[in-house]
């Protein structure tokens, strides 16, 4: 999960209205802060008995950030709360009595405010408002022209083909483009044989992927999670560390070499 955060432009953190902020919620919040991901909050299951919007907003402000603002409230109340989160918003409130959408989008992008929405995903309550806010209060990142990508996942398809999942962070990645990188003390020069744009288990092959695209690439045999290609630097060590260790005891007659090969694949896919 942490590996994915490094390639997100924005995040929606879903919190149970019946449970409130839990330990894992705080962990996710720290990770989002570490990677500087602008975040919207959706407090779900508000249709259940005992879900108290006012109490939840107080908890969010105290445990996560004082910049959590209720966007389900009337616009006037929302803007008054926004005025406490930034000088530009305060100036707009004093001069015009309202905060512009552009100002709010800038504040969200700078993590100066965290919009909160309440509803029920099961009953589609509050979902439309959240989607509208994502459309209104998000900004398209400005990517550099210099080519760069960040690897965040390794997996294999149903046929066993090795997939390198990456985000293009600058320039354009083209199919069959040569990619040079260092791994395990050696330098490798390989080609991006296929660029796949996935939707569920289905994918569409691309000729090229522009900056901001997330694609799965075949043809890279030694890529690894956190690898930076081109102008992109290698990712820093993850914050989360495993707290449990496991021992695998093979049954009599098992092929240790085959087991090791499979374990190496698992290690690639989940290096933690």
Give, region by region, the residue ranges found by the protein language model.
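Structural and coupling elements of P-loop NTPases
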Residues: 1-272
